[in-house]
Curated annotation (Swiss-Prot):
Transmembrane segments: none annotated. S-adenosyl-L-methionine binds at L76, G108, F127, S128, K129, M130, T131, F132. The gene is rlmH. This is Ribosomal RNA large subunit methyltransferase H. Belongs to the RNA methyltransferase RlmH family. The keyword Transferase applies.
Amino acid sequence: MKITVVCVGKIKEKYLTMAIEEYSKRLSRYCKLEIIELADEKTPDNASPAEELQIKKKEGERILKNIKDNAYVIALAIEGKMLSSEELADKMQLLGVNGESHLAFVIGGSLGLDSEVLDRADFKLSFSKMTFPHQVMRTILLEQVYRGFRIMSGEPYHK
């Protein structure tokens, strides 16, 4: 299975970079992982709603250009469906059984995802009703995908 993570914004913190590298290494046993890091738009402190929409649109266009047509797209969105780790593993396994060999997870920038990206998504996944920094979300996502593969493989994982 191929897993692509399309994300907006660079990781600046060394500890997050190290965690992402660690989970990327661990995932290499289970899948082909590709992380596509896209530039984020600068958001003025007092941006109007129209400016925020324009920023999300620009970021969304970049995201959509980096999603392959054959990918099953899972957008991380606060309004998405919450799943347990086991349910995410089951979903990934079922998608694989049904012939979906390429999963693309999408993480938006600080303003979230543009409506066109959400429309392209085959599934909207929420990790919480809380808002997380997109840099931290990348680490959490990789950990959960790794945990999902361990669950699918019947290997021990921390409950």
